Amino acid sequence: MSEIIQDLSLEDVIGDRFGRYSKYIIQERALPDVRDGLKPVQRRILFAMYSSGNTYDKNFRKSAKTVGDVIGQYHPHGDSSVYDAMVRLSQDWKLRHVLIEMHGNNGSIDNDPPAAMRYTEAKLSQLSEELLRDINKETVSFIPNYDDTTLEPMVLPARFPNLLINGSTGISSGYATDIPPHNLAEVIQGTLKYIDQPDITINQLMKYIKGPDFPTGGIIQGIEGIKKAYETGKGKVVVRSRVDEEPLRSGRKQLIVTEIPYEVNKSSLVKRIDELRADKKVDGIVEVRDETDRTGLRIAIELKKDANSESIKNYLYKNSDLQISYNFNMVAISEGRPKLMGLREIIESYLNHQIEVVTNRTRYDLEQAEKRMHIVEGLMKALSILDEVIALIRNSKNKKDAKDNLVAEYDFTEAQAEAIVMLQLYRLTNTDIEALKKEHEELEALIKELRNILDNHEALLAVIKDELNEIKKKFKVDRLSTIEAEISEIKIDKEVMVPSEEVILSLTQHGYIKRTSTRSFNASGVTEIGLKDGDRLLKHESVNTQDTVLVFTNKGRYLFIPVHKLADIRWKELGQHISQIVPIDEDEEVVNVYNEKDFKNEAFYIMATKNGMIKKSSASQFKTTRFNKPLINMKVKDKDELINVVRLESDQLITVLTHKGMSLTYSTNELSDTGLRAAGVKSINLKDEDYVVMTEDVNDSDSIIMVTQRGAMKRIDFNVLQEAKRAQRGITLLKELKKKPHRIVAGAVVKENHTKYIVFSQHHEEYGNIDDVHLSEQYTNGSFIIDTDDFGEVESMILE
């Protein structure tokens, strides 16, 4: 035979083959049929068990036998895939109503593997037989199996809407399905209402089918998500564990979880909660125990004595599978194609299937009844001429001759003649004659009823309704899942996530930051802080791990850093550079740092630039959830930079000090609260080539200390300052010299807690007591404290 060779491109061949493969996967493996809610392997398992008599009213049989039957006759795939599907049909935490009963280890909600199929035994559940009922009455179409040795059903009769009741999940090429299980009684009631009112709306249907009913129970939140899913096939709800509070003898409390979301692995959930406890991501949990036994699921979360149980519960909802989002994606095979279907479409498809099934069954029953009627009429006729019939049979040569004689002599049909010659003598009693008459009457009534069903659509629907009601009455169970209309907002107190602890925060001039335990700080002392050469401590203060640090830079940006996210480093060790926490520019410098507890509206920040701009922004504006990048707090122009930030609880005086010795004092109530991206307004009217060196808050108990580039230090009393209006030039605080004039390089407001100063020159650090610096008059240049000829010009100063 000559070969046929086709010249095809690889792209076409691959595309064609993958298309065929995808079609097979979609239709024959991963997606359920909308009519019976089963995937092919599930259908084959149930049919194989039914065909072999492995039904609910019989003894259990080895699972391996069923797997062998399925593989040998219907499903030529690996035994593990068949056994896995069989096991799932028996798991009451996966299916709302199991379709297979299994003895032995059939896995667990912890995702433990089942015992090998040679150890477990199984049989059909009572409900699954309602899927297969009347399958032998030509109710559904059969097709040849994979090797044409037998037939298998394309779909099961399915006397109840299994797709909705048990749901389905699967992934195929380009398609996925997630249909949740529902309550049997609700689904059947909704179907009955649809039969009575085909134009019923989703809102009306949801009075009966309220929403999913998961086998693991739980609380379903989001009625709008359910409605959207029922309308479109896609929707989203929140599924939350059922958690109750239980007192302990010790005075402590524990949270008891008795129901978890559908498809959640219990052991993984327990492990996750315990990891959150061990990693100190949540404060207040003492112990997590899995106390599940044969009486039911139970997870105990023991809490500390004063723990906020509600906040801990909310934290676990958000950070573990104690609460999940369930996404409806109701895709099923309808008329041979995958289709996204809403609730009405699914019910309509099921009802159309039932109409076809009941019609086929009725035709079959009618045909059988008419055949039996024909036989009964023949027997009755024979009994009416019994003597003649007996004589004819006795005179016949054999069975065939007797049948032929009956047909020829008395006009019996072939079927009637067969029944007559097979009639046993004891059936000729008067009792059996009466029984035939009674059977004839019953058959007449049955045939009339069956013909009425076929001729009358309303009668056919009535049959479907009666059968659905029968199943509802027989298998009705209470709802397990509770439905709540709204999705609860999860509010988590910071105290739950972060243990409250007082620590020492430190920040250096070069941007090294750390938090240190009070024990390490007290053991070392301030002066023993770990620093790089040339670096110095900018600020240190006691803060709480539940606080937030705002680090301000010279580029008008700030870093939002929760204290608990800072590395816990010993006082004597070098801190972590700020750029390792939040990336900043190489030329970006830290100008100040503040600790925020609650970002309350009354507090505000004053931000001042070198070129004399100033702004005021409420503390609440600085709160954010973004920690990974610097955020803008002031729009700073080119060749300008932020020099200081001051946090105030209420309006008060601020003093501005310039390089050329000018000072302006005014109230912050002259500044309006502006957004973080604003550039601000003019603070002081600067002279040419002058710039701001200090902007700080001041009150009548303070003094001002300043140092010039020539090494002179001057301290003035608050009374020297004169309150004025913003944007003025201010007063002069230095005596102007024609030769080598003094220029202020640093200034600070002396508060009650300040006792020492440190002045930094190019080659020297000068330490001194503030009390040793006497108050000066307005128009003086102060006293020299550093010989700049020896140590270079002064650059900066800090107070401690």
Curated annotation (Swiss-Prot):
Keywords: Cell membrane, DNA-binding, Isomerase, Membrane, Topoisomerase. Transmembrane segments: none annotated. The active site is at 119 (o-(5'-phospho-dna)-tyrosine intermediate). It is found in: Cell membrane. GO terms for cellular component: chromosome; cytoplasm; DNA topoisomerase type II (double strand cut, ATP-hydrolyzing) complex; extrinsic component of plasma membrane. Pfam families: DNA_gyraseA_C, DNA_topoisoIV. It catalyses: ATP-dependent breakage, passage and rejoining of double-stranded DNA. This is DNA topoisomerase 4 subunit A. The gene is parC.
